[in-house]
Amino acid sequence: MIAEIRPADAPPGIAAIYADIQAASGVPMINLIWRHLASLPGVLEWAWTAVRPLVASEQMAAARQRIAHSAALPALTPRLRADWAAAGVDDAALPDLAKMMAAYVRGNLTNIVALTALRMRLDNPALPAAVPTPAPPPPRAAPLPPLPRIEALPPALAGTVRALAARHDGTGDGVIPSLYLALAPWPGLLAALPDWLGPLYEPEVLRRMRTRVVQSAEAEAQSLLPACSPTSSGVAAMRPALDRFTRLVIPDLIPICLALNGILPAA
């Protein structure tokens, strides 16, 4: 399993950074990449200090929109409320699911821009740093339920989650995208995803979509390179994860998040 520090287990210093990530990004959860960086001594504070001005900027809001609009998702079959109910998501649960999906869309789009910019900064230390324009603070996001641990799920449900994770490149070594754990309260929905989002899960389609997201994120990040303090001694340890998450894991999940969010019934 990839090392991580979950919010419930975070010591005060890391918990304070997690709270600032939530406040600046407008998302209620701490994504896996940040939880992993927290497990590397000194890295979370260094990385977050570098990208925070970008995360909380007007440029970030515009970049998120452009990447989402450029995704060019394949056509998917609309799903009726009866389909959602059959998958275990009744009318009472749909608002909670919609809130969750909006958070994962925003969080993944934010992270792909910010962390791609950080990766490109490390690759190009002599290039000038951007001076982002601060945006008004986002509304405080309503909390989401804590993520279950994969080992705490019933075996059949854990198998479904692992099977979905295995569809994504970059998820070896026990990496489980947080989205699939967050959807664990709705086992029927998890089981339905390969059918409902079938075109997206075709390996060639998913690779093509991922490449488009990576290219879009790099185009946005070119003008948003963060200023960095002298590099933390742990930066070398974080580079494999930074490359893996910005080139594989996050851009693989963005089309899935956008697609699932897009087929939710209108409120």
For the regions a language model picked out, list residue spans one by one.
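Hydrophobic alpha-helical segments
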Residues: 1-267
